[in-house]
Amino acid sequence: MTDTDRLLSAGRRAEDVDAALRPRSLDEFVGQQAARDNLRVFIEAARQRGDALDHVLFFGPPGLGKTTLAQIIAKEMGAGFRATSGPVIAKSGDLAALLTNLEDGDVLFIDEIHRLQPQVEEVLYPAMEDRALDLMIGEGPSARSVRIDLPRFTLVGATTRQGLITTPLRDRFGIPIRLQFYTVEELERVVSRAARLLDLPIASDGAMEIARRARGTPRIAGRLLRRVRDFAHVLGADIVDAKVADQSLNRLEVDNLGLDAMDRRYLHMIADIYRGGPVGVETLAAGLSEPRDTIEDVIEPYLIQLGLIARTARGRCLNGRGWKHLGLNPPPEAGQDGLFDV
C-alpha cells in the first residue's frame, strides 16, 4: 500500500480538489491565526505601496492549506495565479518560459519547491532578487549572456521538507511561514463549513467526532466527511450526529485517535515483536514493507505528536500512552529508563 492509498494520507488526491469547498479569502480561511494575521498585514502594506508582495515560503506537514493560501494571496492582491510543482520544472528553459509569460503582479506558485533541480534554482535566483533572467544564447566561443527583464511577481513556494531546501534559495524568501496542525475545535469549524457547502445536515457532535479523528489536517477532515456522507445516505440517516459518524469511521477502521490499520501495525510491531523497543527505523521499514521515508515522514510524525512513541538515539520506543492505546501492559523492564511514563 502506498501512502496515497491510505484514507488518512495527507497527500493530495483528485477527490480533494473541490473548488466550491476551498476558502476564497483570509476571512473564510479557518485556522492558522498567526499566519493569517501576518499575511493580512503584508498584503495590505504591499497594496498601499503599489508593489508586489515579497516572495513567500509556506512549510509544514501536507494538507494544511499551503496551496489554498497561495490562491488567496493572488486574489487578495488582485493578481493572476500560475501554479506548477518542482518535479514538473525539469529544465531551466521550462522555468524561463513560465517566468517570461507572467503578467505584472502575478503570483507564481511552486509546490514541492524542495525538488527543484540545481540548474533550475540557478535561474531562479536573479529572477527573485533582480526580476531578471540571465540566459546563455548559443554554444561554444560564440555563446553570450543575455539579461531579460521580468515583470514584478510574487513567488510562493510550498514544501513539506524545509530542511531539503538549499540555503541560498531559502534566504531569498522574504516571508517564511510555518503552518501548524489544526486543533480539534478548528477542524470542527472546517467540517461544519464543508458540510454546509455540501448540503449535508450535520450535528455539532457529529462534526466534532470527525474532527477528532482527522489527525489535525483539514484535507483529511474533508475526506472523512465525504466518506461519512456516503454511509449516512446508505443508512438513511437524516443528519450526521456523533453516532452516525462513529459508526461510519469505525467501519473505515479509523479509531478514536485518528489512527488507521497502518499506524496500529507499526505500534503492534514495536510492542509485540520488540517488547516496546528500542528498535531501528530500518528494521521497522523492512517489517512493514514500507520505505524508510514513509515511516519517518508519514507514519511517525502524528504518533510522536500524540506522545505514543519516542525517537531516541537507540531507536523507536513505545511510550506509556502507546501501550495504553493498544490495551497492553508494558513488560516489567520497560519502565526502568523512564521512556514509558504517561
From Swiss-Prot:
Localization terms from the record: Cytoplasm
Chain sites annotated for binding Mg(2+): T67
GO molecular function term, any single one: ATP hydrolysis activity
Region (Large ATPase domain (RuvB-L)): 4-182
Subunit structure and binding partners: Homohexamer. Forms an RuvA(8)-RuvB(12)-Holliday junction (HJ) complex. HJ DNA is sandwiched between 2 RuvA tetramers; dsDNA enters through RuvA and exits via RuvB. An RuvB hexamer assembles on each DNA strand where it exits the tetramer. Each RuvB hexamer is contacted by two RuvA subunits (via domain III) on 2 adjacent RuvB subunits; this complex drives branch migration. In the full resolvosome a probable DNA-RuvA(4)-RuvB(12)-RuvC(2) complex forms which resolves the HJ.
UniProt organism field: Rhizorhabdus wittichii (strain DSM 6014 / CCUG 31198 / JCM 15750 / NBRC 105917 / EY 4224 / RW1) (Sphingomonas wittichii)
Classification lineage: Bacteria, Pseudomonadati, Pseudomonadota, Alphaproteobacteria, Sphingomonadales
Gene3D superfamilies assigned to the protein according to its UniProt record, in alphabetical order: 1.10.8.60, P-loop containing nucleotide triphosphate hydrolases (3.40.50.300), Winged helix-like DNA-binding domain superfamily/Winged helix DNA-binding domain (1.10.10.10)
Key words, A-Z: ATP-binding, Cytoplasm, DNA damage, DNA recombination, DNA repair, DNA-binding, Hydrolase, Nucleotide-binding
Entry binding sites for ATP: L21, R22, G63, K66, T67, T68, R172, Y182, R219
Alphabetized InterPro entries for the sequence: AAA+_ATPase, AAA_lid_4, DNA_helicase_Holl-junc_RuvB, P-loop_NTPase, RuvB-like_N, RuvB_C, WH-like_DNA-bd_sf, WH_DNA-bd_sf
Description of its domains: Has 3 domains, the large (RuvB-L) and small ATPase (RuvB-S) domains and the C-terminal head (RuvB-H) domain. The head domain binds DNA, while the ATPase domains jointly bind ATP, ADP or are empty depending on the state of the subunit in the translocation cycle. During a single DNA translocation step the structure of each domain remains the same, but their relative positions change.
Protein name in UniProt: Holliday junction branch migration complex subunit RuvB
